[in-house]
């Protein structure tokens, strides 16, 4: 079970923009998150050839080298994805969090975090809604018959996590991500289907 903690809410925690995306933070924190994504990119680079990693070649409003997808027939709102991997099992929709310190997930699915160097637990936004938005857009692009595997990846090497079993979405540390992907259930897609899905996703990339 997740540890018993005292929750202390702090100002400016969990801010969201009007479109539901997390509010843009300071450049230092943006760079911190980018470092975590880069670390996961390196892990994915070593996957076997049967897996296709979607290239980060879009330009966004605040950063470049991202995956930015839009399906105007479904919604006029684009979504930025951290990582997408297509394999025989389906599409892995990976959301990366570069948290240091300690993370606990309680039985209700709430996230609690003690940042490195601090002594109090604070409420942290569960990324489940963000992952859900990405999943729905992805389904509109590839079709609802294609398996989509949602994953939350914790990329910082020093993160300590408890209560992973309380998350409906698998929470996987970076050093175990490749093993999770390679050994995830039996294959259902052919190499031709994997290539077709890659082309379809790439056709929905945009830059702003």
Regions flagged by a language model, labelled:
Residues 1-79, 89-91, 100-105, 111-208:
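Surface-exposed interaction regions that form or flank ligand-binding interfaces
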Residues 82:
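Cell-envelope/extracellular polymer assembly enzymes that use nucleotide-activated donors
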Residues 85-86:
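Conserved hydrophobic "DFG−1" position in protein kinase catalytic cores
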